[in-house]
Amino acid sequence: MLHSFHLARVGVPAAVGALLRPPSPGAVTGLRRLEPMAGMRLGAPVVSAARMQLHRMAVLAEWDDADALDCFFKEHPLGRRLATGWHVRLQFLRRWGSVAAFAHLPQEAARSRPGEPVVAVTLARTRLLELPRFIRWGRPVEEQVRDHPGATLALAAVRPPRTVSTFSVWESSRAMTGMVWGRDAGPVGERHAGAMVELERRDFHHEFTTLRFRPLSEHGSWEGRSDWVPPLR
């Protein structure tokens, strides 16, 4: 099994088509799951062009193996568009919470070392009536992750009406867990932990999960860079 996360500029018509009619496992050999989303800048104003960027696609996918992903790049129209962008191939490590599409993953498949790079993906199916409250608590956390010195790349993605995701690359597992558990200095460091307390008080979502991965290899470029994943230490 292999996971991958993709970022690419595909144009609005292609993005809308993928959001409305994503590739299905039965139609793509070796594809197990695929979550297509529109890119979003973390911490962007609620009403702004940066909040939902249809021309920038973010895709989380699960494959039988690397050959299936390579075949998708060559043979599927969306795959060929994604191949022009950037992606990272991932080994699944841990899961917190549950979203039906990824509930088959074990809570722990392997452990990361404190000093090694990790990738974190959150995926939520939001309760629409809780959306204003989710935004109020979530935007400060978005800014915290976006500006964290230990995160080399951090962004969000959405698929209307209710799917919301974040994707972040961390220089170390230690840096990521320090942010999650509020061990960073100052009031900013408490934002994520505070939002989790509010989540426990009254859930924002129908479903929510956090997935942790080990980055295996990085391909292509995004925003002029091809070195978002730190080297193994």
Describe the role of every protein-language-model region.
Residues 157-158, 165-168:
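Alpha-helical membrane segments in multi-pass integral membrane proteins
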Residues 186-192:
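Compact nucleic-acid interaction/catalytic patches
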Residues 59-61, 166:
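Generic transmembrane alpha-helix motif of multi-pass integral membrane proteins
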Residues 158-160, 192-195, 199:
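Acidic/histidine-enriched, beta-strand-rich ligand/metal-binding domains
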Residues 1-57, 66-72, 83-159, 175-186, ...:
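Short S/T/G/P-rich N-terminal loop/turn motif that feeds into the first structured element of a domain
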Residues 61, 69-78:
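A basic- and aromatic-enriched beta-loop-alpha substructure that forms the phosphate/nucleotide-
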